[in-house]
């Protein structure tokens, strides 16, 4: 897939709010991970910050002394986040990995499935922050593979060019030199508002199976991501 979709308006047309509607939900899970490990990072950078709304929401939940910086290579995304700057929060148009900056915590939230060489991206990010938090959609499931066109539709609308299961997502982190400290599932399919009718129909079986067998729910029915904390 041509990466120009992020600068020529294609991705913005397909995703007009650049997923800002999901930001409070994502920020809540990030804050939950940090609280589990009693982490209070003085500096936080989000790589591929999109609309910037995840950092806006996170800045309202973490300690007031924390400094937040968001980077995105897309001019379209930058137009959405540039007006959200305040004295604790900054946004920059550019590639964080081309800078010399280093932060206490780096966030890559639904990012590396869009990157052509995702291994090189994740390997480079590992060296640029003490801790990293990755949110990784688990697009591979029995249900998604059984539905003709599902993954290709995701490729076209969301720009996903790599597809992961729980095991392959965690293996990618380990293969790029990370030590996975902790991880947990998130379920956009059952926790986010305004789902389509197919997602609504699947909510009950997803919740029922997840309560007794979360790995099986993710593997068979899909609709899940993982949030991983790594060094």
Locate each region found by the language model:
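A short His-aromatic
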Residues: 110-114
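Substrate-binding/catalytic lobe of Class I Rossmann-like enzymes that use SAM or dcSAM, i.e.
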Residues: 175-176
């Amino acid at each position: 897939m041509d990466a120009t979709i992020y600068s020529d308006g294609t991705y913005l047309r397909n995703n007009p709010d650049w997923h800002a509607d999901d930001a409070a939900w994502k920020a809540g899970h990030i804050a939950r991970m940090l609280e589990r490990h009693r982490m209070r990072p003085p500096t936080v950078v989000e790589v591929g910050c999109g609309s910037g709304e995840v950092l806006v929401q996170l800045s309202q939940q973490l300690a007031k002394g924390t400094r937040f910086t968001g980077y995105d290579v897309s001019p379209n995304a930058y137009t959405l986040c540039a007006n959200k700057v305040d004295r604790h929060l900054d946004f920059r148009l550019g590639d964080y990995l081309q800078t010399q900056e280093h932060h206490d915590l780096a966030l890559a939230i639904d990012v590396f499935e869009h990157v052509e060489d995702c291994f090189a991206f994740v390997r480079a990010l590992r060296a640029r922050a003490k801790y990293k938090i990755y949110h990784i959609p688990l697009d591979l499931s029995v249900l998604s593979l059984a539905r003709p066109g599902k993954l290709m539709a995701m490729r076209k609308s969301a720009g996903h060019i790599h597809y992961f299961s729980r095991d392959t997502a965690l293996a990618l982190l380990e293969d790029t030199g990370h030590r996975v400290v902790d991880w947990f599932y998130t379920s956009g399919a059952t926790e986010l508002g305004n789902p389509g009718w197919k997602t609504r129909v699947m909510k009950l079986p997803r919740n029922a199976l997840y309560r007794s067998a979360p790995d099986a729910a993710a593997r068979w029915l899909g609709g899940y991501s993982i949030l991983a904390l790594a060094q």
